[in-house]
Structures are given as structure tokens and as C-alpha cells.
């Protein structure tokens, strides 16, 4: 299983959020790569935009799977690449899980609203990312999110971000077992585009979670674990 993190972080956030749900699945090998320009993965000048990153990720998927079917999951920008990979490799991707996906056609993105916690807790990045401002959420932010910022290649991110939208794929929608999870209070990507996208897929479970924003994997971990567990069960049923 290949799990792709979001923008401005590295594999540590994805691993912290997905691993509790996947650790007990027998025989499931999880791979958490750093996307180009984050963590320990360089972003050479040949990567000019998202289409180039997608091609690199498709090669990675082919390499780590050896051509066998594999699962794909992603959060935020990682979900954007994951759904594109599934569209281009439908016979190879056995299941797709998207959490707070960045997607074309964003609409009705809500204003940021804090639902609980202490005023003034954490730094500006924390307060803009989380809708639960509690000591527990701050601890997760400081452990899994903030340290990755120092390893981001800002110049590379700006270069690739200038061409962030992928070239549309002409094929049919991905038809494998899919999970789409969105935060109702997500002020980064909203939930409307995720709802639209899930509606276009023939075998998608959609969950729009209240009291959760773009940091949904941190804010609603038990619910995410349950949804991922059900998704894995569906994948096994299809196998």
C-alpha cells in the first residue's frame, strides 16, 4: 500500500495518521514516501509541475509493487495524486482512499472556524490548520507536522505549484473500492468538491465529518480508523 502525504509536510504526518488503522492488517506492506521537494526526496529541475510529479509517482508505484495490484491512499495534495494514479492504472490499483482531497473544481470552501479549545494556543500555522485547539492536537502538530517544514524545498514547491493542476485524464472514473473522507469545516479544500467527486465513482463510500477540518486525520482518528477498516474489508472482498 502506497500512502501519500499532503503539501508542506513529509511522510511523518501520513504515517502518524494512517498507520494506527493499517498496522494490524495481515500481509499489508505500507510505504510512506516523501513527495518530491519534501522530506528527503529531492525535486530536480526536470519536475516542472504536477504532471511530472505524477509520472514519477506512477513509476514509484510500478517499482514497489513489481507490477502486482496495490492500494493507494492520500491526504490533501497526496489524495489528488492518488486519485490520478488510480485513473491511469485502474487494473493495478486495488483500492483507493482519499482524505480531505485537493481536487479541481473547489467550491463553497467555508471560512475557518474553531469549534473547541483554548484561544491563542500554538502558532499561526497550527491555528489555521486545526479546528480543535487543544493540548493534544498541539502535541500532534508539534510532533508530526511542524518539523517537516524545515525540510521543504520552497523553491521547488513554488516551481511545481505554478503548474499544480493535472492534465485531465480522458478515461472512465475509477471503478474499484473507494473511500472519500472530508471535513465539514475544512477551510483549505472544503467538502463540496469531494462530494462531487465521490458521486462520480461507482463504488465510493463518502463520509463528511463534522467537527473536523483539513486536519481531520488528527482530529477524528477513531472515525478515520473505522472508515479505513471498512474500506480494507471491501478491498479484500473484491480480491
Question: Over which residues does each language-model region extend?
Answer:
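Catalytic histidine-centered segment of alpha/beta-hydrolase-like enzymes
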Residues: 212-225
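Conserved serine/cysteine hydrolase catalytic core
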Residues: 159-199, 208
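Conserved alpha/beta-hydrolase "nucleophile elbow" surrounding the catalytic nucleophile
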Residues: 5, 74-76, 183
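Flexible "cap/lid" loop of the alpha/beta hydrolase fold
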Residues: 80-88, 92-124
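Catalytic histidine neighborhood in serine/cysteine hydrolases
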Residues: 199-215
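Conserved acidic catalytic loop of the alpha/beta-hydrolase fold
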Residues: 52-69
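Conserved alpha/beta-hydrolase catalytic His-Asp/Glu region
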Residues: 107, 120-173
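Conserved HGGG/HGGXW glycine-rich cap/lid loop of the alpha/beta-hydrolase fold
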Residues: 1-42
Amino acid at each position: 500500500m502506497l500512502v501519500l502525504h499532503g503539501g508542506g509536510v513529509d511522510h511523518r504526518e501520513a504515517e502518524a495518521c494512517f498507520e494506527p488503522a493499517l498496522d494490524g492488517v495481515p500481509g499489508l506492506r505500507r510505504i510512506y514516501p516523501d513527495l518530491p521537494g519534501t522530506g528527503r526526496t529531492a525535486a530536480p529541475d526536470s519536475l516542472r509541475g504536477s504532471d511530472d510529479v505524477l509520472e514519477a509517482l506512477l513509476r514509484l508505484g510500478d517499482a514497489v509493487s513489481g507490477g502486482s495490484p496495490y492500494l493507494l491512499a492520500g491526504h490533501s495534495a497526496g489524495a489528488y495524486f492518488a486519485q490520478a494514479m488510480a485513473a491511469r492504472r485502474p487494473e493495478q490499483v486495488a483500492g483507493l482512499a482519499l482524505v480531505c482531497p485537493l481536487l479541481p473544481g473547489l467550491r463553497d470552501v467555508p471560512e475557518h472556524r474553531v469549534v473547541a479549545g483554548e484561544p491563542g494556543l500554538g502558532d499561526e500555522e497550527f491555528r489555521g490548520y486545526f479546528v480543535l485547539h487543544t493540548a493534544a492536537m498541539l502535541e500532534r502538530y508539534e510532533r508530526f507536522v511542524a518539523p517537516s517544514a524545515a525540510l521543504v524545498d520552497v523553491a521547488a514547491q513554488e516551481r511545481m505549484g505554478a503548474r499544480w493542476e493535472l492534465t485531465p485524464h480522458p478515461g472512465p472514473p475509477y471503478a474499484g473500492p473507494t473511500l472519500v473522507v472530508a471535513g465539514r469545516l475544512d477551510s483549505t479544500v472544503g467538502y463540496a468538491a469531494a462530494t462531487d467527486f465521490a458521486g462520480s465513482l461507482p463504488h465510493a463510500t463518502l463520509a463528511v465529518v463534522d467537527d473536523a477540518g483539513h486536519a481531520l486525520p488528527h482530529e477524528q482518528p477513531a472515525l478515520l480508523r473505522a472508515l479505513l477498516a471498512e474500506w480494507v474489508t471491501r478491498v479484500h472482498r473484491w480480491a
